[in-house]
């Protein structure tokens, strides 16, 4: 399996026998088979299809505990899957984009609606997974759709309604899909007011 992984992504993006304490905000956890950093949704999809049940997907590692004994699994970190673009009043963001970054891009483009996200320490995927929110705003207020893959690499687009977003919950809590990105709809606003919020 290890040689197969090295064919799917760059050698420097695969850390074998890696301690999870380096990849969680709590700074604890034992070793895993490898931590793998795909650089695109395509690489993430290929890894998902290859590793299936032998893997765990992790974003920023915010509020995640890993047992000191470690895990007999591969960990796919989405931190390098971070393409982001702004078109009209919409932002498209890959799963590994930080919540702070998406809020910053919105502000730079005079778009309001994501101010609440600036202080959330996770990624877009983590934010969608738990319908993250703060300061009277949450993901369900601005998301249009989310993109995901199953463990066979099949892609699916989830509409806002299909996401079943509620307090710290989404449809992804109850299924095995891996979030790859999302589209957010915002509104034009005053840049100075947005930055001051």
Where are these regions (language model features)?
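Short loop segments at secondary-structure junctions
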Residues: 39-41, 68-70, 79-81, 133, ...
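Acidic/polar active-site rim loop that often engages polyanionic ligands
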Residues: 86-88, 127-128, 177-181
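Anion-binding (especially nucleotide phosphate/pyrophosphate-binding) glycine-rich loop
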Residues: 1-124
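Preference for bulky hydrophobic residues occupying beta-strand positions
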Residues: 36, 76, 93, 146-148, ...
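Phosphate/pyrophosphate- and phosphate-bearing ligand-binding catalytic cores of soluble enzymes
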Residues: 15-16, 22, 28, 64, ...
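Hydrophobic alpha-helical segments and helix pairs
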Residues: 105-157
């Amino acid at each position: 399996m290890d040689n197969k992984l090295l064919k799917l992504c760059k050698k420097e993006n695969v850390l074998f026998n890696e301690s999870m304490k380096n990849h969680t905000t709590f700074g604890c956890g034992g070793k895993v088979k490898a931590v793998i950093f795909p650089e695109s949704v395509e690489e993430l999809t290929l890894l998902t299809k290859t590793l299936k049940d032998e893997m765990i997907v992790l974003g920023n590692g915010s509020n995640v505990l890993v047992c000191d004994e470690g895990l007999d699994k591969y960990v796919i970190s989405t931190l390098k899957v971070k393409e982001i673009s702004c078109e009209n009043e919409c932002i498209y963001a890959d799963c590994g984009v930080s919540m702070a970054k998406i809020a910053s891009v919105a502000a730079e483009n005079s778009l309001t609606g994501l101010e609440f996200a600036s202080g959330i320490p996770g990624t877009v995927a983590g934010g969608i997974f738990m319908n993250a929110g703060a300061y009277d705003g949450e993901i369900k207020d601005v998301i249009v759709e989310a993109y995901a893959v199953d463990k066979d690499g099949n892609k699916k687009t989830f509409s806002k309604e299909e996401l079943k977003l509620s307090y710290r919950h989404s449809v992804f809590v109850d299924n095995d899909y891996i979030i790859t990105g999302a589209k957010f709809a915002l509104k034009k606003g005053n840049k100075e007011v947005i930055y001051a919020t």
